[in-house]
Each structure stands twice: as C-alpha cells, then as structure tokens.
Amino acid sequence: MSWEIEYKKKLRTPQEALRSVQSGMRVYIQPGCAEPETLVEALMERGPDVEDVEIVHMMTMGTAPYVAPEMEGHFRHNAVFIGGNVRDAINDGRADYTPIYLSEIEQLFTSGAMPLDVALLQLSPPDAHGFCSFGVGVDTSLTAAQCARYVVAQINDQMPRTYGDSFIHVSKIDAVVESSRPLCTTKKAEITELHTAIARNVAGLIEDGAVLQTGIGGIPDAVLPFLMDRKDLGVHSELVSDGAIPLIEAGVINGARKNFKPRKVIVGFIIGSKKIFDFVDNNPIFEFHPTSYTNDPLLIARNDNMVAINSALQIDLTGQVCSDSIGNQFYSGIGGQVDFLRGASHAKGGKPIIAISSTAKSGTISRIVPMLSPGAGVVTSRGLVRYVVTEFGVAYLHGKSIRERAKALIDVSHPKFRDELYEYCEKTKWLQRPAAQVVPMR
C-alpha cells in the first residue's frame, strides 16, 4: 500500500480521532509553539465522557482548558515544566508537577515508568516519501510518538519542515486530522535597562568561537545584540528564539569553529514568532533533535568554549540556586538548566552562567539571600555553580570557599541589601564585613 493511500485511510475528523481517548488513559500533548490546538479543542469536547484521564506535557502555550475547575475528575494535568497557563492549578492542588531534568523526560516514556496511551501531535504535511516533520517542536515529542500506543497527528500546512532527527512516517501515525491554522506564538520580552546592564556583563564573558545556549526572556534577548561584533559563534541549545536571527543573517553565528556538529545550529524546539518559524522552514543550518540529545551533558561537553546562560529566582550565599519555585509555590521547572551547566562545566573552555537581576518585586527584595526561602527547592547545587552575573558584575564561585563565595555574591548584590547580607555572615561567622564597610557603633 502506498503511503498516499494509507494517509487517506487514516483521515479523521477531530472528534473521531479523539474517541481513542478513554477513561483512565494517559495522554501526551506536544508542547510549546507546536501545541496541536485543534486536537486539544476536540479533547475538551471529549471531557464530559471520560474520567481520570492524565494529561502530560512539558509546557503548552495555549489556554490549557483541561485544568479548568469544571474539568476536575475528567482530566488531571501533570506538567514536567510549568507554564503560566497551569501554574495556578498546580498550586491550587488541581494539577501536578513532576520535577525532572529535561534530558531525562524521555526516559520516563521509554522505560515504561510513564507509559503513554495516546500522543497528540502537530506535524507538517508529508513529503514525497511520506515523512512528516515535527517542525518547531521535536523536543520530547518524537520519543513520545515512538512510545505511545496510539498516535493522533494534526497535519498543518503552516507547520515548518525542519531538518535533523525530526521526521515520522505516515505509517507510524494512527489517525490524521487536517487543520490549517497559525501556530502558537510568544511575544518578544520587553528589554529593560536592567536587562541590558546584566546582558552587558554576560556578553563580556563570551569570546569569538564560543558555542551558545540561551533560554527565552529579557536577559537572553538582551545578550544577543551585544554579540554582533563577535566572530564564528555556534549554537547548541534546547531552544532558539527570534533573537538569534540577526546574528545568523550577519554571519556571526555560523558554527565555523564548532568541533562538535560544525556549521549547524543544534536545537530541540523553537519558541517565538512567525518570523522564526519561517526562518527555520527548510533551513539546513538548523538541525533538530530530541531534548535527550540536545540536553545530554556528555554531548554538550563535546563543544569547546560552551557558554550556557541560564536564570534563577533566588541564590543563597553558598551558591545554591532555586529556579523552579518561589518558596513552596511552584513557578516553572528544572528544565535544561542543570543539563547545560553540567555540560558546560566539563567542556574545554566552558562557562556555565547564572544570570539574574539582583532584586525582584520592583527592587523591594533581594534575589541574593542568606538562605533560600522556606520550601524553595535547590535546582542547581552549590558545587555546580561557577559564574553568577547581575547588573553589578560577575561573581566566580568555582573552587571558592564558603567565605569567598559569600563575599563574591555580596559584591554583585544590590548595594541596599549588602548590610543585611553581611550581618548574616557575621552571625554565622562565615565572613567579617570589610573594614571600610563596618557600621560604627552608636
């Protein structure tokens, strides 16, 4: 049977395709900008007819209707990375959060620890050989499709065709739903003067020939424009967004000096606007892989001069990093931070960087704290942290004692909080305030 005939036989309406979801099943939804919204809408229509269906995904960009209070009992959401659309539901106890390294999520599927009944995907139309592309979202979805008992694909002619390990054949799909609609997009973060100040300090650590990993948000977006005078940069990252386009077009990012996968932008998924979607479409400089590959610390470490730039919510004076919760309120997830910091720390000339603003809540609280807030989780241990960058400078912690770490972190904290940080250090006998900063007794 030709793939064309097989494809036509598998065509279904969204409602027909989602009848595959039965009570008690576990359903995977392709995350990020590749979220199959037509299938999600049909899944919600199915909701009143099913009970105890677990929905698993990394981070979706849609409205997440499955966590609405009226869906309780029908759907239970389990996020391996928390987005703003499910944060309240998780902290209200109506949904779950599974903390895990991004590099290890696929192991849950392949090992049977988290068996998948149904995978809901969004793919490009098949090519002349019957292969559909995962487009902007290979991430954990290729492996999910390989492990799920039933695969439903939303075929969208607006999904880019991307290169790399990013294809699935029509024969591996059980139901096809054709739906042409724009992909989910994200707005570019507003770059503030604060972001620019932090970015300037980060950029000072990036040399010609460096290989970059950056996330999304104001700080990463602010770093990239500072690199327009660099030469032969490369990219090995879990994600890429719009900010990389000018550097690629200018030839700054060309991968010429990469010793691992030279001349290729290695990426797991794309987050951004239609501009970046169009840019990656049939663009051979991009090579997409599952995040078990992009985030493998051993592979990351093969990149000489690997620079990993990640952020955090809090850092204590010993160097412990919290990046997934605010106290006991879960905020995001572990994601790829540890994967890339570990990989960069083992790379020749590597630089693992935590870049944060020194304060939060309009400058009313310090992000550099004596102790992490009660209930906060340590995502990155003090032994792994090397560079901490704020708008006030760079603290280098690797190989430093607790006394030296505390001093370095206080030096890059906001000046208005330094006295109380020193007071804590004096009470714990970690560190004495420098003579010039001793507060005279009254």
Model-assigned labels for residue ranges:
Residues 1-442:
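Conserved alpha/beta enzyme-core scaffold
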